[in-house]
Each structure stands twice: as C-alpha cells, then as structure tokens.
Design a protein with these regions (language model features):
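Bacterial N-terminal signal peptides that target proteins for export
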Residues: 1-11
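Short charge-dense sequence patches
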Residues: 3, 69-70
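Aromatic-residue detector
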Residues: 4, 14, 28, 40-41
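Bacterial N-terminal signal peptides
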Residues: 9-19
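Residue-level recognition of conserved structural "scaffold" positions that shape functional pockets
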Residues: 19-20, 41
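Boundary at the C-terminal end of the N-terminal hydrophobic targeting segment
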Residues: 22-25
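Extended, well-structured beta-strand/loop surface patches
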Residues: 29-69, 75-159
Length: 159
C-alpha cells in the first residue's frame, strides 16, 4: 500500500500557479555572526502551497545535514503527524515541481501548536544563540520547527 506524502514547498523563483502580486512576497531573515540567512516566499491561503527560496551566505548545520552556502528550495513534507524539511538543490523554475532526487537532504521537524490559527502560511527565522537559529513553518492550525547553526566544524563549542 503506497503512502501519499503531501508537501508545502518553498520554491525558488517564479511559481506559475501563484502571482506575487496576488499574495505578496514575504521574507524571513536572521543574522548570525554578520551572515544573513533568508527565506523568501509567497504566502497564499493556508490550504495552498508556499513558494519562495532559501539563501545562505554561510555553511549551515542542521540535525544530521550539512548545507553548503548557496541558494536552495525548501519543501515541508507533511506526511501525517510528522513533518520533514527537504532542502532541495533545484532552484528557479526547476523548483516548481518537487523532485526528491534533487534533495540535498531532509531533516526532521518538531511539531508544535501555534498560539492561534493563521489564514496564510508563513516561515519565520529566530536567533536562539549567537550562531544558531530556529526555522518555523506555520500553516493553518499546525506548525513545525527545526534548528540550525553556522557550520564551524565538529569542534564548535558555541552550539
């Protein structure tokens, strides 16, 4: 029996099914050690998809995944009660359709309950330590988060 996986993409570039003017371009950013990490996305209604891009000017470390500096597409895989963040190498119009073969990797997300339901999906980035941040995705009455840090190697004692 096949398991269906739903996803909320944060696709780089123009996604033909949404107009930036219709939903408004949104941006979340956080600065860690003078490096600004950004997620740019379009925020449609909570039952639609999120589109945007993930840019990091520094190497990052998520739980079990090192992400070299660069431009990526984020997809939130919402398979039942547990969500995963897929960091995908496809950008621009190539990112309009999710291709798991292009994943750099996936990280687990912690499910949390937002304080109140939202009408539009959104990403937030919040600094949690001098070189660490939390990425949160809120959509309708569900939310998930994962943390990351600047990747300074295995001897980094600031994490």
């Amino acid at each position: 029996m096949a398991i269906m996986t739903k996803y909320l993409p944060a696709c780089a570039g123009v996604l033909l099914s949404f107009s930036a003017a219709a939903y408004g371009q949104q941006m979340a950013s956080v600065t860690l050690d003078s490096k600004t990490i950004m997620v740019e996305y379009t925020a449609p209604a909570a039952n639609n998809r999120i589109s945007g891009s993930f840019h990091t000017p520094a190497d990052l470390a998520f739980k079990g995944l090192n992400v070299p500096k660069g431009l990526y597409t984020l997809y939130v895989l919402t398979d039942g009660p547990r969500w995963q963040l897929a960091i995908n190498k496809a950008t621009g119009q190539e990112a309009a359709t999710y291709d798991p073969k292009q994943d750099l990797g996936r990280v687990p997300m912690l499910m949390i309950r937002p304080p109140a339901p939202v009408s539009a999906c959104k990403f937030t980035l919040a600094k949690i330590a001098p070189i660490a941040a939390e990425l949160q995705v809120v959509c309708s009455d569900k939310a998930a988060s994962t943390s990351f840090r600047l990747d300074r190697g295995a001897n980094d004692s600031q994490w």
